[in-house]
Design a protein with these regions (language model features):
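Bacterial N-terminal signal peptides that target proteins for export
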Residues: 1-9
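C-terminal motif of bacterial Sec signal peptides marking the signal peptidase cleavage site
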Residues: 18-21
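Non-catalytic accessory segments of hydrolases
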Residues: 23-198
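Short glycine-enriched nucleophile-adjacent loop
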Residues: 234-245
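Active-site loop->helix "elbow" adjoining a glycine-rich segment at hydrolase catalytic centers
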Residues: 134, 199-203, 231-234
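A conserved short beta-strand
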Residues: 247-259
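Alpha/beta-hydrolase fold nucleophile elbow
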Residues: 218-230
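Alpha/beta-hydrolase active-site loop
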Residues: 110, 193-216
Length: 263
């Protein structure tokens, strides 16, 4: 069955997302906002750095490495780390087909996300915006850059965070045959993923669960989360909008350029 995108639906998604940045920030979230560049999380402490008017935390694991018996499985909780994790560089990109983008080194251990939050830490919780990159669900990563010295990061959340007073999250997810490979041999084996071919979408949902559990420590409001994306990331936003399993993990959505269609 094909669901055709309605222009009114697309417009509504954009309007709802725009309202998210203006939402009330006064509601307490029950977790104390942490100051400085070291944040204590349930899985361990992380140390970021101040960049411009933001505190930036890069390469935070939000799921266990999807390797070995976890390949083509639903993402599992991250393995706690001892000590303090240096969160100052992007994690590896997920394995993918070649593209014209500059991409970090690839590794199956790629389920990491990044957080930008205004510096100094806010006095009250801020709206949260979670970004899904494009690339046809076949290439791309949060650390992509314009190659040949022609520019910097493509998905840098710093300016959005410091200029619009929001907490920005960007996340990797599995791509291509490791993230969207539908095969009868893979269906039904994983109770958390009974249908094969949705691992990349499940990674995005796991990132949203991480945000719900952890973003308050960064000054974000887990009850005011907007998801947004472009191209394939935009289409993925539409999937989460209509998926009952993603309900409650976000509150607004912005679909930028990717069609809200499915078969």
């Amino acid at each position: 069955m094909r669901l055709r995108r309605s222009p009114l639906v697309a417009l509504a998604l954009v309007v709802l997302g725009s309202l998210g940045a203006c939402a009330d920030r006064s509601d307490p979230v029950g977790v104390q906002i942490q100051q400085g560049t070291v944040i204590a999380l349930a899985d361990g402490a992380i140390e970021g750095e101040v960049v411009g008017g933001t505190r930036r935390f890069l390469g935070i694991p939000f799921a266990a490495p999807p390797v070995g018996p976890l390949r083509w499985r639903a993402p599992q909780p991250p393995v706690p780390w001892g000590g303090t994790l240096a969160a100052k560089s992007f994690g590896s990109a997920c394995p993918q087909r070649p593209s014209t983008l500059g991409t970090p080194s690839e590794n199956e251990d790629c389920l990491h996300l990044n957080v930008w939050t205004p510096d100094p830490a806010p006095a009250a919780p801020l709206p949260v915006m979670v970004w899904f990159h494009g690339g046809g669900n076949e290439f791309g990563s949060t650390g992509d850059f314009i190659p040949l010295g022609l520019g910097g990061l493509i998905f840098d959340g710093r300016l959005l965070s410091e200029r619009r007073d929001v907490v920005v999250v960007t996340t990797n997810y599995r791509l291509g045959k490791l993230g969207f490979f539908a095969h009868a041999a893979l269906a039904g084996e994983d109770p958390d993923a009974p249908y094969a071919g949705n691992q990349g979408l499940l990674d995005q949902r796991a990132a949203l669960r991480w945000v719900k559990s952890n973003i308050a420590a960064f000054g974000g409001d887990p009850d005011n989360v907007t998801i947004f994306g472009e191209s394939a990331g935009s289409a993925d936003v539409c999937v989460h909008v209509v998926s009952p399993a993603s309900r409650g993990l976000f509150h607004r959505a912005i679909s930028e350029s990717g069609g809200c269609t499915t078969r």
